[in-house]
Amino acid sequence: MDNKEIYKAVLGMIDLTSLNSTDTPSKITVMTGKVNHFHDSFPDYPLPASICVYPNFAKTVAAARENPDVHVTVVGGCFPASQSTLPVKIAECTAAVSDGADEVDIVLALNSFLEKNYEAARREIVEIGSTIRTINPAVLLKVILETGALQEKALIEDASYLAMEAGADFIKTSTGKMQPAATPEAAQIMCDCIRTYHAKTGRMVGFKPAGGISTPEDALTYWNIVSNTLGKAWLDKRYFRFGASRMANNLLSALEDRPVKYY
């Protein structure tokens, strides 16, 4: 594939994201409307994989979207700090799925993980996952490792395996709310773990880099890591996503050879 073919494919892997304190139902409805009418302006390019918002906007996106192939993703479990009690996290995620969320991105409980209380961190993922799947068995659970807080290879490996063994459908680098966010180094470690886990279990776990990803060059970097480490089977939105707010316009600009500010 040449670079433009990759840019086009990546457009269809983006979780188009708005996670701002100033988000309103009107703003989220406008963003969803742009996705609905994307093919009016760009008929040859794919729609984003999902629209990613705070949990209180799950119902807004679900009501406004016209194509169910564009999923409703929420960040849940008291994102981005994950600092609350498990019942509160479960309640938030459950409400979002009841409101129409197809995917839930939660943050690994670093308050437990960094204290080496791995069972508590694992239990949160298991209980959130099992509860939301009683509402929608097809719901996807992504677990954010916040690799910028871990940094050491061994910690990123431990967090990756813990999340996958607890039932994560995807592991995700970062919330985007702290620095460093996604890095190629962390992505490589996580993809190595996904490959090893798949070899042992046969289960394909997805990978989602997020945070600070905005350029076509970023897209190529993470595409190549996934392609070279995990192979062609992972080059599909079922197993590979990008968390991004600015990258869609930048990819469109690169594809069109002109400045594009559609989203």
What residues fall within each predicted segment?
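N-terminal beta-loop-helix "entrance" segment that forms/cooperates
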Residues: 250
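Alpha/beta enzyme core
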Residues: 2-46, 56-207, 214-245, 253-263
